[in-house]
Amino acid sequence: MQKLILLSIVLILISCSGKGQNKTMKNKTMTDTTKVISRTEEEWKKILTPEQYHVLRQKGTDLPFTGKYYLNKEKGMYACAACGNELFSSDMKFDSECGWPSFDKEIAGGKIKKIKDYSYGMVRTEIICAKCGSHLGHLFDDGPTLTGMRYCVNSTSVDFKKK
């Protein structure tokens, strides 16, 4: 069972690793007036489900093609599942065929921070909620839209608010 989980993780990382990861990303800071949330890990454990805690706080990853928002085509807003910070509009979503919800840009206002991630022997850009510091997914520069960006987001990391 552990070998299957390890194999799944390796395949997930390979499929999301993208190409051309040598571009540098600058960390963006939050520019709107939203107050930053600071909680202990014990407080997060009480607020979040075990699955949410694993993904949002321990930087876990949904299995590909299993997330509830992967194929969602409804109009609305995607917000951080931990704090409600609005991150993406459905107009920013596209089908990247990578197995996770993908967006080509974020809502303005510095609501997402970008951090270099050196885990698993790769260099990637992790995206976290600027309001609460929760893990959302990773950012790649292989998107097919005009921005060239692909925000690869875990369904567990977001809630969807239908318009």
Where are these regions (language model features)?
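A short Gly-Trp-Pro
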Residues: 36, 45-79, 85-163
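Bacterial Sec-dependent N-terminal signal peptides
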Residues: 1-26
